[in-house]
Amino acid sequence: MSFKKTSQILKIKLKKSKIAIIDIGSNSVRLVIYPDSGKYPYPLFNERINCRLGEKIHKTNNLSVNSISRALKALQRFSIIIKNMEVKHVIPVATAAVRNAKNNKEFILPAEKILSSKIRILTKNQEAELAALGLLSNFPVKNGIIADLGGGSLELILISKGKIKKLVSLDIGHLVPVDQKEVLQLLESVKWLEKSKNLKLYGTGGSFRSLGSAFIKNTSYPLFLIHGLSINTETSVMLLDKMIEAKNKFPGIPQNRMPTIKNAANIMQNLILSCDPKKVIICGTSIRDGIVSEINPSKIINPDKSSNIKYFTKNQRFSGMQNTIKKILDPLVENLIDRKFKRLLKLACQLSDI
């Protein structure tokens, strides 16, 4: 069945001001503070604390006392930061671990008291849609599959002609031990996945970013730029195979990821084998970017990033520097380039001093 996008996911409307988004995930709790309701593309503050709320939830269906304690301490710290930075609008959201736990009120009630704000527990569809919206608002995707692998869930979204066509959220994540048979059974239950081969696979979440980091380290890739990194499908499968066999360490993988990297690699590898993509593209976006996009309805899907230039130029060290550089270059390229390149040259000049 095709997916019809609602007009809004969380129905958030805010006046122009600083906003704080708190992403309470299965593995970590993250605070990101943006100026100007998130229209400015670079955050004022960004911090993540590993709380592992989803740890052992697959065994007990409950959040553990220790994980709740860790998460509440993280929120206490974040609450102080939010107050000191004079942020009026706080948007806390929780995903798979809190959503699936029978005892989630033992965490939610004290957490809301600490933050003085209601925590939105995202449904599976909301989480998947926000993950897709976050990527589409920051990356040009016409057709492809978005895979957001977290600690407690895997969201799969089919994109057709730049829009969400189908989506699903599976209860597998790098904190949930599953064998290959279980992963394959869950992936086979997604009927549209098998029919969506030879598309680009866009991977988001810490596990996919770890794959990107491992690729850079193990292939001597010249640039350490993970967002937008494109990896050959065969290379991805081979690298994930090595990650599955790794024991105590693996080049490019953060040490705190090693305890769950085998499970994450197993999920990613079987996903890649199931949908047989053209390429695997690593993306640094998240549901937080989706929330920012929803707050700013004028920020259309697959936007022209030149609209962000006015925010970048505000942070120039020397006012008017972009105009000076352009005046120097214009005579050199006047008869050599077309209108499209001239536009790009102008943007490059505007970005030259930020």
Predicted regions and their residues:
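N-terminal glycine/serine-rich phosphate-binding loop of ATP-dependent small-molecule kinases
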Residues: M1-A20, I24-V29, Y34-A94, K105-K118
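A generic fold-level signal
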Residues: L14-K16, S26, G151, S196, ...
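Short glycine-aspartate micro-motif
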Residues: I19-D23, G144-D148, L201
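Ser/Thr-glycine-rich phosphate-binding loops at phosphate-binding pockets of nucleotides
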Residues: S26-S28, L135, G150-L156, G206
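Helical "lid/coupling" subdomains associated with nucleotide-phosphate turnover
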Residues: I33, K56-N84, T95-K105, L115-S137, ...
